[in-house]
Curated annotation (Swiss-Prot):
Highest taxon in the source lineage: Bacteria
GO cellular component: cytoplasm
GO BP, sorted A to Z: asparaginyl-tRNA aminoacylation
Annotated keywords: Aminoacyl-tRNA synthetase, ATP-binding, Cytoplasm, Ligase, Nucleotide-binding, Protein biosynthesis
E.C. designation(s): 6.1.1.22
Principal location class: cytoplasm
Quaternary state and interactors: Homodimer.
Classification via Gene3D superfamilies: Bira Bifunctional Protein, Domain 2, Nucleic acid-binding proteins
Family: Belongs to the class-II aminoacyl-tRNA synthetase family.
Gene expressing this chain: asnS
Catalytic activity: tRNA(Asn) + L-asparagine + ATP = L-asparaginyl-tRNA(Asn) + AMP + diphosphate + H(+)
An example Gene Ontology molecular-function term: asparagine-tRNA ligase activity
Protein name, entry field: Asparagine--tRNA ligase
EC top class, as a word: ligase
Length: 464
């Protein structure tokens, strides 16, 4: 007897009339005279499959006591279903109950609406819900598509370190990594913590970005990317921030900002097409329950050419919009989400790439433009969310990089390895960063980024 996934059984990939076995969990159960209709899910797709058990089964009394969350193995014949909205069902020849729910009344995942706030408290159980099952499958689809896109386009995947001594963003909001005894810290003669006696012999941190490290491989392999966890010790209690999240960071050699922007557009459209093609059932559920535009916004995004405008032009448009914003609009200030959304939703009506930002609001490694006031940076803005990608052409001139590092108060000796890239065969290169959870939020229409990752880490919250 063939063990099949629910997805394959419902998709008609198994011959009708064949004997099959499915393994999964009870979503719902209803009964009538001598019959039990069990909706079983195994997580392979959104829809459950109906298992029909009759009172001829020796354990039918047990079967009738099944509740949501119980696990089972059902064997039987796959037949076309007469029920509405179902393609196939299983006429059971046997139902083995593997695991009971200890107390159905106190089981946290009940067949009723549950708020995201409550489900964050039981994050270890929330993938059993319709919502988080859908989000998880879409997250997986996006991750697979990320690797597929880069592989098909000749990129090498680079595993950059999680433990580092460098602050790639220059913001100083990093988590320290130490094996020192916090109760009895070793001290120098000056009374400072003696990190030479720490595990690595120096002060180390969790990475805020893999970009600096991946640049090394870009300048040898031409097209590379990193996709891994990053950490920010920002004390931000917002719906848009996490302390631990995943970043996608491609880097391309012999490239300028225009090529970087083209790559970003191709990349996003590829990802959205993959989700539309592969996870239509989950998107349909999200469109019904979470975001009515879950499908239409992705289709519109794919079909719209990106608009590109200069930061200075964007500021003028915002200042002349006649709209009252909560945050000021002035040249030299970063654009806020409300500004980004006005540009994409009310003024232009499609994705926008804003380029050439003031040099003092962007990172030290971004290439200084000829005007001496702006850098070759870009933000990709999407309707409904604002910034979704941030990138730049990197500063390939050693003297300019050194001046920028001095401006930011960075010790160039500490970054000597990074400066080596400019000393030995330097070339123009560019790249961008895409926060993976922000991407999941956008695709799924979620209102809180803590629902876009299995176990959210945020200020005051590190459960599970």
């Amino acid at each position: 007897m063939t063990v099949v996934s629910v997805e394959h059984a419902l998709a008609g990939k198994i011959p009708e009339g064949g004997e099959v076995t499915v393994r999964g969990w009870v979503r719902t159960l209803r009964g009538s005279a001598g019959l039990a209709f069990i909706n079983v899910t195994d997580g392979s797709c959104f829809a459950p499959i109906q298992v029909v058990a009759t009172d001829t089964l020796p354990n039918f009394d047990e079967i009738k006591r099944l509740t949501s969350g119980c696990s089972l193995i059902a064997k039987g014949v796959l037949v076309k279903s007469q029920g509405k909205g179902q393609s196939f069902e299983i006429q059971a020849s046997g139902v083995e109950i593997v695991g009971w729910v200890e107390d159905p009344l106190t089981y946290p995942i009940q067949p009723k609406p549950m708020s995201p706030e409550f489900l964050r408290e039981v994050a270890h159980l929330r993938p059993r819900t319709n919502l988080f099952g859908a989000v998880t499958r879409i997250r997986n689809c996006l991750a697979q598509a990320v690797h597929r896109f880069f592989h098909q386009n000749g990129f090498n995947w680079i595993s950059t370190p999680i433990i580092t001594t460098s602050d790639a963003e220059g913001a100083g909001q990093m988590f320290r990594v130490s094996s020192l005894d916090m109760v009895n810290l070793p001290r120098t003669a000056q009374g400072e913590v003696d990190f030479s006696r720490d595990f690595f012999g120096k002060e180390t941190f969790l990475t805020v970005s893999g970009q600096l490290n991946v640049e090394a491989y870009c300048l040898a392999l031409s097209k590379v990317y990193t996709f891994g966890p990053t950490f920010r010790a920002e004390n931000s209690h917002t719906t848009r921030h996490l302390a631990e999240f995943w970043m996608i960071e491609p880097e391309i050699a012999f490239a300028d900002l225009a090529e970087d922007a083209r790559l970003a557009e191709q990349f996003l459209k590829y990802l959205f097409r993959a989700v539309l093609d592969e996870r239509g059932d989950d998107l349909a559920f999200l469109a019904e329950r979470v975001d009515k535009n879950a499908i239409s916004k992705l289709e519109a995004f794919i079909n719209a050419p990106f608009e590109q405008i200069d930061y200075t032009e964007a500021v003028k448009l915002l200042q002349n919009s006649g709209k009252k914003f909560d945050f000021p609009v002035e040249w030299g200030l970063d654009l806020q989400t409300e500004h980004e959304r006005w540009l994409t939703e009310e003024h232009i009506g499609r994705p926008v790439v804003v380029t050439n930002y003031p040099e003092h609001i962007k990172a030290f490694y971004m290439r200084l433009n000829d005007d001496g006031k702006t850098v070759a940076a870009m933000d990709v803005l999407a309707p409904g969310i604002g910034e979704i990608i941030g990138g730049s052409q990197r500063e390939e001139r050693l003297d300019v990089l050194d001046a920028r590092m001095a401006q930011f108060g960075l010790d160039k000796e500490h970054y000597s390895w990074y400066r080596d890239f400019r000393r030995y065969g330097s070339v123009p290169h560019a790249g961008f960063g895409l926060g993976f959870e922000r991407l999941v939020v956008y695709v799924c229409g979620l209102s809180n980024i803590r629902d876009a990752i299995p176990y959210p880490r945020a200020p005051g919250s590190a459960e599970f």
